[in-house]
């Protein structure tokens, strides 16, 4: 369920962005803007948007599309590392559960027993070269970058005076937010469907209260997130809706190839078992 937890955390961050958009400063960002966040995060993103737009004859719409894709591609190695770490944790999960079951029978509330269990789990992680925290670090690196780009779009003054396709980038649109909401739904649905499929291969999940609670939260978010995106998009500059649409499409493709098309866990677990040296 680790993947679901991280997805929920990421979408919680997006919800925070939506909320902050309504109450944060909308002063134009410039090289003279004060503060570490403005100077080292938001302004460089704004500069990149403007530079790419200038190369495209002033098309800020195309610039937002291209920069969104470039940022997502730049973050792809982190995403792959995160997915690899989570995948490794899922592969060794049967061994982890066996250790936890063994110490539960011994009396898991005993501090000494807990210490022994943690020591054995740590040995298991080291044996397979797995770091349980490795999947979290990429997420905390991605969020500031995505937030900076988000606010750069909000505060780059030149964007406000340009159009793209049928909409004015500086004004709310009444079509694009629904496209953003629909793509958000499909992105989340794809992740949720994969997790439900994974749960079928792990019967212990059906009896796990935490896993069931996460499933319920995912079901709620499946409908809450698209609605939040649509409501926000109807009141925010359409440049942000464009960013959400392109980002969602990229994430749908990424999730399909990295998560959905990944080999079944059973295959990797079988490989792992066959690679173990036979005891004489």
Swiss-Prot record:
A Pfam family hit: 60KD_IMP
A single BP term in Gene Ontology: protein insertion into membrane
GO molecular function: membrane insertase activity
Lipidation (S-diacylglycerol cysteine): 23
Lipid-anchored residues (N-palmitoyl cysteine): 23
Signal peptide: 1-22
Main location (coarse class): membrane
Keywords linked to the UniProt accession: Cell membrane, Chaperone, Lipoprotein, Membrane, Palmitate, Protein transport, Signal, Transmembrane, Transmembrane helix, Transport
Function according to Swiss-Prot or TrEMBL: Required for the insertion and/or proper folding and/or complex formation of integral membrane proteins into the membrane. Involved in integration of membrane proteins that insert both dependently and independently of the Sec translocase complex, as well as at least some lipoproteins.
PANTHER family associated with the record: CYTOCHROME C OXIDASE ASSEMBLY PROTEIN COX18, MITOCHONDRIAL, OXA1
The family this protein is said to belong to: Belongs to the OXA1/ALB3/YidC family. Type 2 subfamily.
Name of this chain's protein: Membrane protein insertase YidC 2
Lineage: Bacteria, Bacillati, Bacillota, Bacilli, Bacillales
């Amino acid at each position: 369920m680790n993947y679901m937890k991280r997805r929920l955390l990421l979408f919680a961050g997006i919800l925070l962005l939506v909320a902050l958009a309504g109450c944060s400063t909308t002063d134009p960002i410039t090289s003279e803007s004060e503060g570490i966040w403005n100077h080292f995060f938001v302004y460089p993103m704004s500069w990149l948007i403007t530079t790419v737009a200038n190369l495209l004859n002033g098309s800020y719409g195309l610039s937002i599309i291209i920069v969104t894709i470039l940022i997502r591609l730049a973050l792809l190695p982190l995403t792959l590392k995160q997915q690899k770490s989570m995948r490794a944790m899922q592969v060794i999960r049967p061994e982890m559960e066996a250790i936890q079951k063994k110490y539960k029978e011994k009396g898991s509330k005993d501090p000494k027993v807990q210490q022994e269990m943690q020591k054995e789990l740590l040995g298991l992680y080291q044996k397979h070269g797995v770091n349980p925290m490795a999947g979290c670090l990429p997420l905390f690196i991605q969020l500031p970058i995505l937030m900076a780009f988000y606010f750069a779009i909000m505060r780059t003054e030149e964007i406000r005076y340009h159009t793209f396709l049928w909409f004015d980038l500086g004004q709310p649109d009444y079509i694009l937010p629904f496209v953003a909401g629909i793509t958000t739904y499909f992105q989340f649905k794809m992740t949720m469907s994969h997790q439900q499929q994974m749960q079928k291969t792990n019967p212990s999940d059906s009896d796990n209260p935490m896993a069931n609670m996460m499933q319920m939260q995912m079901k709620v978010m499946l409908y809450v997130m698209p609605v939040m995106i649509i409501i926000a998009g109807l009141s925010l500059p359409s440049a942000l809706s464009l960013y959400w649409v392109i980002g969602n499409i990229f994430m749908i493709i990424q999730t399909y190839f990295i998560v959905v098309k990944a080999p079944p866990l059973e295959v990797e677990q079988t490989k792992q078992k066959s690679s173990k040296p036979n005891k004489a």
